[in-house]
Regions:
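Non-ligating segments of multi-cofactor redox enzymes
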Residues: 1-188
Length: 188
């Protein structure tokens, strides 16, 4: 078990669907065209930006998705080479591109669709919660760049942390808890 478990709280009522988080992550990680480490969905609709209700009473709810950095990650358990790893010091799940063979087992195993295959480099890629930034004392780019301040980052395993308190206060829930992976990203 990790000493810490970094995670995130996403307050969907504050997300305006601008995709700054998606684009910033894509640029920071120098992803090739078509490979994204996060995405945005419109809750309740297959097509993004569709609204509920009729004018003047309309609403739309966006849900940003990223790797859930699960306490029991299916991608790690199913990786045949050990390339997908969970860092013990903070619970971040990441890919070792030197060990990854690009087989896609992690992509199929993840119930959240977090890993993607980088066809150019022939490796699996995914959100690493901006681990290099975090190790320098900075927040993940998706957190600090969000104009709606929809995301909160921290150690979800520390009951005294701001994020753990916010999760408790808001009644936030992870996605697909029935999968048994114990995700570390919560939504309210």
């Amino acid at each position: 078990m990790s000493e810490k478990q970094y995670g995130m709280l996403v307050r969907t009522s504050r997300c305006v669907g601008c995709q700054t988080c998606v684009v910033g992550c894509h640029v920071l990680n120098e992803c090739p065209e078509g490979v994204y480490l996060g995405h945005l969905e419109t809750v309740g609709h297959e097509d993004n930006y569709l609204v509920d209700g009729t004018f003047p009473n309309v609403s739309v709810t966006f849900r940003p998705h990223l790797c859930n950095h699960c306490a029991k990650p299916a991608c790690v358990e199913n990786c045949p080479t050990g390339a997908m790893r969970k860092r013990e010091e903070h619970g971040v799940v990441e890919t070792d591109p030197e060990v990854c063979i690009g087989c896609g087992t992690c992509v199929k195993a993840c119930p959240y669709g977090a890993p993607a295959l980088d066809e150019e480099r022939k490796v699996a890629v995914k959100c690493n919660l901006c681990r290099p930034r975090v190790e320098r004392g900075e927040e993940p780019l998706c957190v600090c760049s969000c104009p709606g301040e929809a995301r909160l980052f921290g150690d979800v395993s520390d009951p005294a942390s701001d994020i753990a308190k916010a999760i408790a206060e808001t009644g936030a829930e992870p996605l697909l808890p029935e999968e048994g992976t114990k995700p570390s990203v919560y939504y309210c």
